[in-house]
C-alpha cells in the first residue's frame, strides 16, 4: 500500500536531516537542496537513502529534476504509483 504524502514528507525530511545534518523542523516542501548547500554527492546520498527507505528505484531520468523536498516526494509518489 502506498503511503500518503504526509508520511512520505516525514520520511524525506528525516532522511534530509540525517544526510545533510540539518534541523528537520526547518524543512518544508518548498525547501530546495540548494538552500541546504547540498552538492552533487549529497544529492546522490539523499536519493540512495530514499530508495533504501522506500524500497524503490528512482529512474535516472528523474534524478536531475529532484531539487527540493517537494520534488523528492513527487518522484517517490510517481514510482509508487507505477
Predicted feature residues:
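Phosphopantetheine carrier-protein modules
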Residues: 18-35, 55-65
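C-terminal structural segments of small proteins and small subunits
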Residues: 57, 64-81
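Thiotemplate assembly-line natural product biosynthesis machinery
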Residues: 2-24, 79-82
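Phosphopantetheine-attachment site and its flanking helix in carrier
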Residues: 34-52
Amino acid at each position: 500500500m502506498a503511503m500518503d504524502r504526509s508520511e512520505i514528507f516525514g520520511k524525506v525530511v528525516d532522511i534530509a536531516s540525517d544526510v545533510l545534518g540539518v534541523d528537520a523542523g526547518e524543512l518544508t516542501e518548498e525547501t530546495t537542496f540548494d538552500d541546504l548547500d547540498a552538492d552533487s554527492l549529497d544529492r546522490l546520498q539523499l536519493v540512495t537513502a530514499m530508495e533504501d527507505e522506500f524500497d524503490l528505484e528512482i529512474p535516472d531520468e528523474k534524478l536531475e529534476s529532484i531539487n527540493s523536498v517537494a520534488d523528492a516526494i513527487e518522484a517517490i509518489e510517481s514510482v509508487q504509483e507505477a
